[in-house]
Every structure is written in C-alpha cells, then in structure tokens.
Amino acid sequence: MRIGTRGSKLALAQAEKVRRLLKEQGVEATITVIKTSGDVQKDSPLYMMKGYGAFVREIDDLLLKNEVDLAVHSLKDIPTVRPENLVTAAVLKRESALDVAVIRNAERLADLPEGAVVGTSSTRRAAMIYRHYPGLVTKDIRGNVDTRLRKLRDGEYDAILLAEAGLIRLGLDLKVERLDPYNFVPAANQGVIAIVARQGTPEAEVVKELNDETTWIETRVERIIAAGLDGGCVVPMGVYATRVGDEIDVIGEVLSLDGRQQVRVRETIPVAGCEEHAKQVSEKLVLAGGLKLAEEARKELDR
C-alpha cells in the first residue's frame, strides 16, 4: 500500500505509526511525501487559508487519482464537506485531546507577567487566552513544532500553545502546563489520526481493522456539533466529547475573537443514538447565540 502524507516531522511520525500498525496486520506499506498549500504558505495565519483544507487538499487529490492508496491526516484538518468518494476508513485511538502551554520562565500561564506574549496560530486558543488570562497578549506563530520551540527559546514568545498529542508522537518530553479541557476546550477531533481511503476499495476494508470504536464515536459527535455551526479552523470554537460506558460527556463552546463573549453547552448524551443527540446539542449552541458569534468572528477576520 502507498501512504500519502505531509513531510513535517509530526506528519511523518503519524504516517509511520499507521505503516507500523499495518505491518502488524501483515500488510506492507510505503510512505509518499506530498507538499500541501498549508506547508507552502508558511507566513500566512491559518485562518487566512480559505477553501478545502489547506493541509489535506493535495494529498486527497492524489488519492482520487489513484497515485496513493491511503492518506494519513490529523482528523481536525479534514473539512466537514469533502469529495464524495473519499471516506475516513479508520481513526486511531486518541492519545490526548488537550492543549498544553510550553512556558519559558514560569510554571503556569497564570504566573506570567502582564503583557507576556503567547504564541498561537489558532483563533480558538487566542480567544481562550484572552478570556482566562486577560493580562496576556497573543501573537501569531507558524512553523513546525521544532521551529516554534526555537522561537520560544530565542525569546520571541514567553509561551507557546501546542496540542499535547503532537508532542507525544514526536517523543518530546517537555515540561508543560496541561490545560483543563473543560476550561480550555479543545478543537473538535484534536489529537486524532485519521486514515482516508477511496470508498469501496480493498484498502478501505483493510484499514478498518485499525479503527478505535470509542474514538470513532467521540469524534463523530464532535464533528456533528462543529458542523452545525460551520466551525472550521477560523471559528474560535471548542468541542470535546468523552465516552464513559454507555454515555458521552459533551461540551461545546463558541467565543468571540476577544474572548469576552462566550456561548457554552455541556450535556451527557447516550451512546445509543448519539448522532441525533449531537445534532440537538449543536442546535442548542445555535439557539444560545453560538452561530451568531461564529458569524461575527468570520466577518471580522474577512475585513
């Protein structure tokens, strides 16, 4: 099998994990590195990259042309609307959904002095910093994890925010502050590796063996809630679902770009019929003003 992926250290680590799991199933695979528009436009904030997913488009194009058999993506990078004949055939077990702060001269974000600069390329993380740490300032940061850590060490930032799962996959044992997911609500599908295939192909059937059912259910619920508010990477929105037995604890939150306004819904829903219940949670977010906040954020960023 031919696995298509981006060329960053993190993307290669994710693809290598899939290749290793396939080998354990007796399936040999090779890795093909593909440059995406998200890799090329390194100086643009992520919210300025419009259209079909900046980090997945070119890889999916090659998948559709049968030049690779599988694509390995971070699930949160995959748009809600996508080519009909591509499917997410499997998701691997989620290692962590949490955001973490890597801080230069303090133990916690709360210990940083007023005016300290926090690096993030996410409108969601920036809005949550403004809400929970109003004395701090955010500044856009791009580049791979190594580049961001170097910028932190060089003093361009006092702290940077990253996904914990990425640090785990890269084998980086850093001193971090793990941010409470019920205050600092993660992005929908954060921390999940997805394997995409052409619908109805033998490859799609083979990789189904790697699917983690609990992660599949949790991420499906998160995705439905986010879709109800058209919550792409532009919107300051977090959605986090955790399954415990036959129930799923769900929290959805939308913020204004400055973090001052917040719409939040938290509920426990049953696993049985969870997709319909997720739609209801999304509708509650909309009725509470979440869609209005999301639309205002999009308009402000388009100016």
UniProtKB/Swiss-Prot annotation:
Binds 1 dipyrromethane group covalently. It is an enzyme of class 2 (transferase). Keywords: Porphyrin biosynthesis, Transferase. It comes from the Archaea. Its cofactor is dipyrromethane. The modification S-(dipyrrolylmethanemethyl)cysteine is found at C233. HAMAP family: Porphobil_deam. Belongs to the HMBS family. This is Probable porphobilinogen deaminase. It comes from Methanocella arvoryzae (strain DSM 22066 / NBRC 105507 / MRE50). The gene is hemC.
